[in-house]
Amino acid sequence: MSAGSRALEAVIRMRDEASRTLRQVRDATRALQNQTNSTSQAQERLQEQFRKVSNAAKIAGAGIVTGIGAGLVSASKAGAEFETAMTKTSTMFGDTKVDTENLNNKVLELSKNTGIAASSIGESLYNALSSGIPVTKDMGSAMDFMTKNAKLSKAGFTDIDTALTATAKVLNAYKMDVSETDRVHKVMMQTQNKGITTVGELGATLAQVTPTASAMSFSFEQVGASLANMTAQGTPTAQATTQLNSLLAELGKTGTVANKSLLSATKGTKYAGKSFKELMQAGVPLNEILNLMDGSAKKNKKSLIDMFGSIEAGKAALALSGQNSEQYTNNLKAMSTQADVVSSAYAKMSNTLESKVGILKESFKNLGIEIYSKLKEPLKNAAETGIQCLSDLDKQFSSGSLKAGISQIAQSFGDLTSTIIKVATKALPTMIKSLSWVLKNGPTIASVLVSIKVASIMTSAVKSIVALKKAWIAAKLAVRVYMVGMAEAGTVLSGFQILVGVLTKNMTIAQARTMLLAKASALLGGPIGIAIVAITALVAGLVVLWNTNKGFRDFVINAWNNIKETTTKVWGGICNFFTQTIPQAWNDLCTSFSNAVQWFGEMWNNIKQAFINGWNAIVAFFTQTIPTWINNIGVWFGQLPAKIGYGLGFALGKIISWGISVWTYLVTNVPIWINNVVTFFAQLPNKIWVWLVSTVQKIGQWGIAMLTSAQIYTSMIINNIVTFFTTLPGRIWTWLTNTVQKVVTWGSQMATKGKEGAKKLINTVVDTLKSLPKKVMDIGKNIVKGLWNGITGAGGWLKGKVNDFAKGVIDGFKNGFGVHSPSWKLRDLVGRFLPLGIWERYKSRIAKFEEYIDNVVSNLTQRMYKPQEIEESDYTRKYKEAIAQRTEQNTINKTDSKTTNNKEDNNITININLGGVTVKEEADINKLTKMLVREIKLGIAGGV
């Protein structure tokens, strides 16, 4: 490698090291910036969470306070309204001592049941008492009247006051007793049902007609029927009552057109000579009278309206007569119905959601009223105390005793304000100058703070810069080698080589400058060219470094961003300090001074109230407490002799009474005791004899019953024993026969199936001998080996099943016993004794089990040894036929063949590799069977 290549390699390595170092500086700066940003973001998130919690707390607190305040205001308002209404009602009590607490409870109960405001019921109760409803101690009659009107108001789509005043006006107009309330309500409800009107409309207008109707003896039922007829035809309720009033007035007033027409129409009838009032008293319906007048008008070729002096009365007559007469009759009949139409309508109107919500709302208001009633007296006392205190304070101010103190406080506060203004006046210019200096020197302050920020960043980059220095030093050796090579070659150093020499300290700056100036002067022609080239080279170098070195580019970008961000934060902090912190502090200072007046005022009030309370307590102690003590002591000593005498007399009386009671008790009960003792001893011998006789009889009965039972049960036991032993041999024989038969059947089937299997195997082999002579031995060998493996493998399968069964038993026992972890109960109470118990049971049964197995195997062996006793199967028959056929074939082959090799070719044997047995004929099968039986016995004895 040439010296130039080595130098170039050193420079490249130096550049790579510098890039790596710059990347480390960039990474350190970026990590610091990320950490700063993360900290700022975490702080901002924490502040945001605190702001959310604070806002939520403010909202919740405001909601709670608002709800509580609204509830208190609502309760206070409802309670005050109810109190005012009931107080207003109490002015109607007169001399009657009404149980006001009971009355208030009844009103609240009615409000809760109907959903009508308690204050409205109280106001209506006042109107009811004003209209003449009687006042009693328990107010039972009045509250019954209120309850009925509350129901009518719901059923008639109006308020309770309208329903009540209408009812009261009708009762007063007709001079009815309050007991007629149901009758009036029924008529009003039927009028609403039959006409186009409501109880509310009737309540507002009935007073226009009821006085006239009552004066004319026109019943309220006829008023209702008339208004129902008229409103059903479209006449508004107010006009209908006006028209009906005009009709009644004209018919009843003497000398009117209607009165004369009535007298003319009744001539020659049973109503002749009677006035309208007399006809009404006689119970004649209005429509019948109007029909008579209509007939008279038609005779005179007039209309019914001509029979009246006013158009209003004529309209009413037309609505109640002629074709409308039948409807009037039906309406009049409906007014006297026996059905409780008010309660029915009330029940329907109360079963709506609006009604239920109203009841719930009034229940809450009534709860507030009850709370208010409990608190109103303490609140009254507190208000009176406050009024008294304010009055005393006003007197103190007016009398001059507090005037001087207030003046002194005002003067002191004025002096304090003046002092603050003076201090502020002196300090403000200095603060303004300081602010101006800060504003003027803002860039300098910012640069200082930026320097602090940059210094903190560069602290983490020092190590990277040290690494950069080491990279430059690392290139020194290569440069030296390069220079030696250049010296040996006798060449002149280039500008790049000179730069490398300077950077590695192998060439001084003066030497490099001299060499570069010489080269530049020679090439560019003077210092100006050199300057241009230098600037161009610097710019080109920076551009090349920016374009080719990502570490340098990132470092510059991050450094600039950090400087810009730090400057922004520092300058923002300075601006916030002078635009927010200082004004806020000034506002807080002003607020503190503005609140000082209130604080001094409250402090003075507290001091004054404390002195007033103390003085009142002292005065009360000497004017109330001590006189009360003295009075109580005097009363106590005054009552002492009487109480002592009373106590002695009471004790003496109790003693005498006790003595009399004891004597009376003894006189009464001692003879009874003696009589009972005498009677007891007189009856004792007879009772003993009766008991002995009864006992002896019961013992005899028991003995007889026991003997009889013993005879019966002894006979039954003996019979059962005889029967048992009589049937025992048969049962044993039956069991043995069944058992032996099952064993024999099993052995027979096994022998038969074994022979059949062997014969089928041999038959199959014989059938395939001609085509596969070489595979016969392998087939026989594999079949027998598979059979044997199946027999011996059954032991492992059986063992696995037994293990699974035992494991299932243990798991089920553990779950049923509640054991889910190693337990001392299972270890000490079950585990210790379980193997011993199994062994004891196994040891007690092993001899019988071995004997049973030996018997079974012996029987099976005997049956296998004597196959002639077994019924010959198809397989055996085919096997014998095959053997006979083979023997015959061998005989033919022996006869026809002249060579000895034919016997070897045709007598093909089956060699089964199992104890060296060769199967040729049936005897070989028996031999093979015996060997298999022996192996089975050995396998069973060894425990498969």
From Swiss-Prot:
Pfam family, one: PhageMin_Tail
Residue ranges that the Swiss-Prot or TrEMBL entry lists as coiled coil: 13-52
Signal sequence, start to end: none
GO biological process: viral tail assembly
Function: Serves as a base for tail tube protein polymerization and acts as a template for tail length determination.
Family to which this protein belongs: Belongs to the P2likevirus tape measure protein family.
Name recorded for this polypeptide: Probable tape measure protein
